[in-house]
Amino acid sequence: MASREETRNGTAGPRSRTSAGSSRDSLAGAGWRCEEVGVSASGGRPFSWMNPVPLWQSRNQNLVRLFGDPTNEERRLWMKLQREAGWLPEDLIVRVPPRREAGRQKVSFILVGDTGEGDASQRAVVKPLLAGGRDTDFMVVCSDVIYPAGDAGDYDAKFYEPYDDYPSPIYALPGNHDWYDGLVGFMHHLCGADVSALPAAEGRPSSFKERLRRLLWRRPARRGPEDLPVRRRTEEGRRTGQRSPYFALDTGPLLVVGIDTGMGGPIDREQAGWLRGISRTDKPKVLLTGKPLYVDGEHHPYPMEDGGTVDDVVLDPNHNYVAAIGGDIHNYQRYPVPVGGRDEPLQYIVSGGGGAYMSATHRIPKVDVGGVTEDDFICYPRRGDSLSFYSKLYDRRLGLGMGWLEIAPGEAAAYMAERLGIKPARPEDHEGYIGKRARRAADWIFPLPGSGRTHYHHFFSEFFDWNDPPLFKNFLRIDASESEVRIRCFAATGCAEHEDDPPLEDEVRIPLQRK
């Protein structure tokens, strides 16, 4: 493992400081053998996708698939509103003063994705996040700040309260769920917009499909300024200066570029032009996106309204991108994609495990995409842990909790190794035995060999939220200097022994080259 990470994935980092190590090392490191449930894992308000209300509030995503995506039109209205309020184009670049250590510029930040359920699974990430990142310069929430539909009234319980102890600014990129109220809550709380002044969309519907979409579309309640919730985190030292759903953070050694991918349509012309322009600057860059460019063994380059793709911009050698990180999918994945003319691979990362229900990694087929093979690919949770986790969910929901559908972690790891022809991650799983009952359960839960994205599993994954350890949540800590970017993925298991010392699940160091 170490030699592979040192060649294709960058320089391998040290193991976690926890005595149990990480999920690569032991069942305890994965959270299967909690000494005690963490305090933060028992907090928060209940939230469940089993409730039909959140599903109905999230109906706009299905309407987009049927009738088209209005995100670009609505984003243009927001940008027009901000300009009329005195916003200037240069306000899209927020300057974050770097620290100086031994005469060199340094910056550190936390990235956490898909956070906003407000329940125990979100709160369980907070204490490990503070333990691993209280000293960082800022945080970025990457996609889906507020579930189920981005409402302005949900920010206290699902954004302000959970991260109240984080002392530095928190920036954010909207996800599809934040767009379900037309981005009203996001623009009010995170961009300081006067949302009561937003004009209605111009023109009459041009087709029957558009008329039907407008009829069924979930819209936010119209509110006057006096009816809106109070903004918080406005004091000196925690104020961001963010004014738009897309922006760049000039941190000194690194330019952090964040784009708004809306609900799934192409990037609008205005944002695409800005992205191309900001990418021409000389500094090394990391791109943050609502939706990842590589995910579940597939490449999604993401089209732009005026032609080309987001990935075209990332791959341009003159733009000096070293990584592209997206949320939306609720786990961790890393694809070190080799690029011609570069000494180091370009790191494509999924990091959406900040609180929402866990997206199954056992659904990911054996990886062979963009020059990345299974030997190069990293995911968290490991596929066997994911299958074992989901077997407990299915058993609880459909098996009456009798244990008929449960698959032990070792058996699940052996099953996935057999199915995909891969090696189990943990040493203790290498001699894994699959009993007849466990094999029958696994065959039922995972019916198609190597098929990781069936509608069957996607449907149930949204319903089977879980708030008990192991939770398999994650956050990233990114440290940049003038010579390298270091990206670490830490786990939040929900176990008390991991709260103050979160397991390190993955690490990559990227040497920086200045143009």
Where are these regions (language model features)?
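Acidic, histidine-bearing metal-coordination/catalytic regions of metal-dependent phosphoesterases
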Residues: M1-F138, D156-L173, Y180-F247, D282, ...
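Active-site neighborhood of phospho(di)ester-bond hydrolases with catalytic His/Asp-centered motifs
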Residues: L111-G113, D137-D144, P148, S168-N176, ...
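Catalytic Cys-His active-site segments of thiol-dependent hydrolases/isopeptidases
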Residues: E344-S359
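Short, conserved loop/helix-junction motifs that constitute active-site signature segments
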Residues: Y163-P167, L315-N318, G340-D343
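Short acidic-hydrophobic surface loop/beta-edge motif
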Residues: F247-T251, Q333-G341
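Short, flexible/disordered intra-domain loops and linkers
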Residues: V184-G192, G297-G307, R363
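Active-site-proximal segments of metal-dependent phosphoesterases and phosphodiesterases across multiple
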Residues: M263-G273, G277-A323, I422-A425, I434-F459
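Active-site environment of divalent metal-dependent phosphoester hydrolases
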Residues: G118-A120, Y147-G150, H177-V184, G264-I267, ...
